[in-house]
UniProtKB/Swiss-Prot annotation:
GO terms for molecular function: ATP binding; tRNA binding; tRNA-uridine 2-sulfurtransferase activity. Its EC number is 2.8.1.13. It comes from Listeria monocytogenes serovar 1/2a (strain ATCC BAA-679 / EGD-e). One of its GO terms (biological process) is tRNA wobble position uridine thiolation. The record marks H129, Q341 as: Interaction with tRNA. SUPFAM superfamilies: Adenine nucleotide alpha hydrolases-like. Belongs to the MnmA/TRMU family. The gene is mnmA. Keywords: ATP-binding, Cytoplasm, Disulfide bond, Nucleotide-binding, RNA-binding, Transferase, tRNA processing, tRNA-binding. GO terms for cellular component: cytoplasm. Its main location: cytoplasm. Residues 99-101 are annotated as: Interaction with target base in tRNA. CDD domains: MnmA_TRMU-like. It comes from the Bacteria. This is tRNA-specific 2-thiouridylase MnmA. The lineage of its organism: Bacteria, Bacillati, Bacillota, Bacilli, Bacillales.
Length: 371
């Protein structure tokens, strides 16, 4: 990298939150030629006619003016609808539980946004993600963020070398508390703004209500695996494997959990007990396998994996198959593996890549969690 940072243009994806605000502030302090871009991915006027994106953009403007950088808003609603939201709905129609954040990073934040940034002469793009990139030989490795509780490599597992070579993650080596501290010291307008939660395009809204606006709900029976009818479900798309809340089953004994779905019969299967044997599996088949480096991969990889965000790593053996899928075998049984979610591979702190959980297996038999 050039010793004179002012020759290096970095376009920062600014959301109006504290993380991206501090990202822009740090890069500006380091002397880079910084431009702030606000991505409008969703038309999110709420029931009171207030567009939360407008409020967020107002915060971007305040922060950009405070740190002295130019800023723009760019509309990616069409790309988002085509690449992320359509996928999200299609997965729910199949009875699965998708992870739109993974797709959003792959298709929008590090593709559509990256391409737009390059049209502005960007050498790099930067975001407020808690992750790190490190040059090793000719390749860039993706590493976990230092703050274990905030590490976001799980959502970045589909990024390619071409994308990783163009990104900067200034917050990757920091704890969240440090980031807030920097924002306060710099007097940034977003220093005390609370972190956003939930899926980007739903925001704080009720998930069930939101989904019902796009997919017709079909209520049906809630049964045990032995066929006992325990009640009605509101629509299979509202439930995920291992879910406890919202089932409405009373009575004594241990709580009830979702253990499977029958799409043809429109039946939700439930069983009692957090550790019910049906919730455990020993392997999975994953599709959409992608690796963060271009180096030749052995057919069998010993590593660790995460099957959901903020989960402890599990030791696994990954068998890459001729058809581009992978069989992932767990060292110990894992609870509530959910089709549609990401499986992400790690070698220590290095994120190797990942895929989408397609089918779940136990003792050589496919489990009909979704079928």
């Amino acid at each position: 990298m050039s010793t004179n940072n002012s020759d290096i243009r970095v376009v920062v994806g600014m959301s109006g939150g504290v993380d991206s605000s501090v990202t822009a502030h740090i890069l500006k302090e380091q002397g880079y030629d910084v431009i702030g871009i606000f991505m409008k991915n969703w038309d999110d006027t709420d029931e009171f006619g207030v567009c939360t994106a407008t409020e967020d953009y107002d915060d971007v403007i305040r922060v950009a003016n405070q740190i002295g950088i130019p800023y723009y808003a760019v509309n990616f609603e069409k790309e988002y609808w085509d690449k992320v939201f359509t996928y999200f709905l299609d997965e729910y129609k199949l009875g699965r539980t998708p992870n739109p954040d993974v797709m959003c990073n792959k298709e929008i934040k590090f593709k559509a946004f990256l391409e737009h940034a390059e049209s502005l002469g960007a050498d790099y793009v930067a975001t407020g993600h808690y992750a790190q990139v490190k040059k090793v030989g000719d390749e860039i490795e993706l590493l976990r963020g230092v703050d274990n509780n905030k590490d976001q490599t799980y959502f970045l597992n589909q990024l390619s070398q071409d994308q990783l070579k163009k990104v900067m993650f200034p917050l990757g080596a920091m704890e969240k508390t440090e980031v807030r501290e920097i924002a306060k010291k710099a007097g940034l307008a977003t220093a005390d703004k609370k972190d956003s939660t939930g899926i980007c395009f739903i925001g704080e809204r009720n998930f069930k209500q939101f989904l019902s606006e796009y997919l017709p709900a079909q209520p049906g029976e809630m049964r045990t695996l032995d066929g006992e009818v325990l009640g009605k479900h509101d629509g299979l798309m509202y439930y995920t494997i291992g879910q406890r809340h919202g089932l409405g089953i009373g009575g004594d004994g241990e709580p009830w959990f979702v253990v499977g779905k029958d799409l043809k019969e429109n039946v939700l299967f439930v069983e009692q007990g957090f550790h019910h044997e049906t919730l455990y599996s020993d392997s999975l088949i994953a599709t959409d396998i992608s690796f963060t480096t271009n180096a030749e991969k052995p057919k069998t990889i010993e590593c660790t994996a995460k099957f959901r965000y903020r989960q402890t790593d599990t030791k696994v053996t990954v068998h890459l198959r001729e058809d581009g899928t992978a069989e992932v075998v767990f060292a110990d049984p894992v609870r509530a593996i959910t089709p549609g979610q990401a499986v992400v591979f790690y070698d220590g702190d290095v994120c190797l890549g990942g895929g989408t959980i397609d089918t779940v297996w136990k003792n050589g038999q496919k489990l009909d969690y979704v079928g």
